[in-house]
Regions:
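Active-site nucleotide/adenylate-binding loops and adjacent lid/helix of ATP-dependent enzymes
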Residues: 12-14, 197-363, 410, 472
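ATP-dependent carboxylate activation and anion-phosphoryl transfer catalytic cores
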Residues: 1-171, 316, 324-331, 335, ...
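Conserved N-proximal alpha/beta basic substrate-recognition cap immediately N-terminal to
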Residues: 113-250, 263, 499-500
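Extended, charge-rich helix/loop segments that form flexible
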Residues: 339-399
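Glycine-rich phosphate-binding P-loop
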Residues: 488-510
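Short acidic loop-to-helix transition motifs that present clustered carboxylates
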Residues: 238-244, 435, 560-563
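Short glycine-biased active-site loop of nucleotidyltransferases that positions the nucleotide triphosphate
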Residues: 191, 247-249, 311, 439-443, ...
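ATP-dependent carboxylate-amine ligase catalytic core
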Residues: 506-637
Length: 637
């Protein structure tokens, strides 16, 4: 499939194309081309269409990515320019940490590797950049912003695209904590073997599922908080609209209405003033209840004030946020609907995993609230007039987050921590209404609305207003004080026979009989000496071993053909043992832990690199290589 520019048959290119891309391959981890997950592909000229000069492409690209104009030494080839462009576009204008790339130029073609997290998104980026280069060649324009939005949305819908998931994943990468997605389970794993933690967003396997379920039973939870002496609004659970009207009349308007089981403020209506509003609010609450849940709605006294979220991690207060409903400001010319559309086009509301604001959502609740104000989506409001679009400060519907961490009264911090310490949950969000968090809850005017066992955290990391609070770090530091706390010993060979692998397992178990050792080579998979199923996908075997929550140590073989085909699942080996390695297998020596030991055998010559020093000697006649590497393995046990 290697194509030169003079061959007539291309792999993917059309007759009008100047460039061709083929042999696209996605690696989940380190590979021969890049030390991270990557999309790798071949790039060449077709010979059909004469390309522009490199500088002409660069000037157009520089209008969108001016940082590309200032590269020392410039770009030596079309492939190099293409690779850098893919890397820039691949960050999707939302600061993704996917900025690594490489370009290996051959005689007729280049092999390009760009850092990748989600294969489908990365492929879309490559094809978009290819279309862009062809359009520039033909002196045509493309709808750049629209194409970027489509790819942004693709990433946002991926397993990595949720704001909380991405914030934790990126922070783990910075801290050197190994992280990978478990597709069959729909969970993220942080760390290896017995050091691992698994979870999704801010819910982790160490959390009590009983406590987590309890937080969704808003009525019981409220009763529990009341027994602790904390301020909760009075109210009742109702099953019918007539019951709702009766309860509201009993406790007095205004009231708040919300489903017993719900999240993200969906179906919640605050400040309901009369029976007519109550009927509409009750209907919205009913619609928000999942099909598999009973029809139960809370009607409670509405507390006046601002909407706040207090966040605790591991029982400790870490952040607070004020949440305000979305609003628009009139210009005397545009309708409210047009003002919303204009606001939704702003950079801050791109609704990506790294944007501070979501898009403003139009729905029945918005239209009813506008109607209460004597307005509609078609209304044109005066210049400078501010109109709030809903009663509830729902961030997922376009609400605005404002950091309040440093203004919280000490009594309110104690309240949050007292509540959090009654639950075995890593993260706990406490939603409250108050005039200000700077006033003690003991002075009145403070009501706890509900608690949340899976709170979103990106709003604290990137609030619309105020200082950032690095909540992802606080969460990960709950489990891992440093990156070493997330790792088990990893021993990597480029070539090892089954008998030698079994001998190493026995050697380690003699010293640590209570350990669980995982081992894999091209022929077998072991847990201790018990043989396990060998998956045809080699890295699935490695992942399954590292997924084992009892695993103390991993031994893995990575031959060159496996590295070329699948790449390497993990990095950070503690010992790498190379027996007459190929050029490809030498990548194992590049992906070691900082204090790792490298043992290399070339013919009869031995080289051992440890702690910056190199020891070299020749094997004695009939001296086995195992005598060399077993001594080194002993140093990490």
């Amino acid at each position: 499939m290697v194509q030169s520019r003079n061959m007539e048959i291309r792999v993917n290119a059309r007759k009008s194309d100047a460039f061709d891309i083929f042999n696209i391959k996605h690696y989940q981890g380190a590979n021969p081309y890049l030390e991270t997950g990557a999309l790798v592909f071949n790039f060449t000229l077709t010979g059909y269409e004469e390309p522009l000069e490199i500088e002409e492409y660069l000037q157009i690209i520089g209008e969108f990515y001016p940082q590309m104009l200032y590269v020392e030494g410039g770009y030596n080839s079309y492939a190099q320019l293409f690779a850098r462009t893919v890397a820039e576009v691949g960050q999707l204008d939302m600061g993704l940490h996917l900025d690594k790339w490489s370009c290996k130029q051959g005689e007729d073609e280049a092999i390009i590797a760009v850092q990748s997290l989600h294969a489908r998104t990365s492929k879309s980026v490559v094809y978009f950049v290819w279309d862009w280069f062809e359009a520039m060649t033909q002196k045509q324009k493309i709808v750049f912003d629209e194409q970027i939005r489509v790819i942004q949305d693709m990433f946002r819908r991926s397993a990595y695209g949720g704001p909380t998931v991405y914030a934790l994943l990126r922070t783990a990468a910075v801290k050197g904590i190994p992280t990978f997605y478990l597709w069959d389970e729909g969970l993220m794993q942080y760390g290896y073997g017995k050091k691992q933690v698994r979870g999704i967003a801010t819910t982790f396997d160490s959390d009590s599922h009983i406590d987590s379920d309890f937080t969704t039973r808003k009525d019981d939870c409220k009763a529990f908080l009341n027994t602790l002496g904390f301020p909760v609004p009075t109210g009742s659970i109702v099953l019918t609209r007539d019951e709702a009207i009766y309860v509201a009349k009993s406790i007095g308007y205004p009231v708040a209405v919300k489903p017993v089981v719900g999240h993200k403020g969906i179906g919640v209506t605050a400040d309901v003033q009369d029976a007519e509003e109550l009927k509409a609010a009750f209907s919205r609450a009913i619609k928000a209840i999942p099909d598999d849940q009973p029809t139960r709605v809370i009607v409670e006294k509405s507390v006046s004030g601002a909407d706040f979220r207090l966040l605790c991690v591991n029982g400790r207060f870490v952040a607070a946020m004020e949440r305000r409903p979305a609003w628009v400001e009139g210009d005397g010319r545009l309708s409210i609907d047009e003002l919303i559309e204009r606001e939704n086009r702003t950079k801050a509301r791109r609704d990506t995993p790294t944007s501070a604001l979501s898009k403003i959502q139009r729905d029945e609740a918005m239209e009813l609230y506008l109607e209460e104000q004597g307005l509609s989506l078609d209304s044109v409001i005066e210049k400078g007039q501010t109109v709030y679009l809903r009663k509830v400060a729902n961030l997922s519907a376009g609400g605005v987050s404002m950091d309040a961490t440093h203004s919280v009264h000490p009594d309110n911090i104690v309240l949050a921590q007292d509540i959090a310490q009654h639950f075995r949950l890593t993260c706990l969000g406490i939603d409250a209404i108050a005039q200000s968090l700077s006033n003690s809850w003991k002075d009145g005017g403070f009501g706890i609305l509900e608690i949340n066992s899976a709170p979103g955290i990106f709003m604290h990391l990137n609030p619309a207003t105020g200082e950032s609070v690095d909540v992802p770090s606080r969460i990960l530091e709950t489990f891992f004080a440093s990156d070493s706390d997330a790792k088990i010993p990893l021993i990597t060979f480029n070539n090892i026979a089954v008998e030698e692998l079994e001998a190493i397992i026995d050697y380690i178990l003699l010293q640590h009989p209570d350990w669980t050792i995982g081992a894999v080579c091209k022929e077998r998979v072991f847990i201790n000496r018990a043989e396990k199923n060998l998956n045809k996908d080699y890295n699935s075997n490695v992942q399954n071993l590292l997924r084992n929550p009892k695993l103390d140590l991993l031994i893995a073989e990575y031959q060159g053909n496996i590295l070329e085909r699948e790449g390497m699942f993990y990095t950070g080996s503690n010992i790498v043992i190379l027996d007459n390695p190929t050029e490809t297998e030498m990548m194992l020596a590049r992906n070691m832990a900082e204090e790792a030991i490298l043992v290399t055998k070339e013919s009869n010559s031995i080289s051992i690199k440890r702690q910056g020093l190199i020891e070299q000697y020749a094997l004695g006649e009939n001296e086995p290589f195992s005598r060399v590497y077993l001594k080194e393995i002993a140093t990490i046990l």
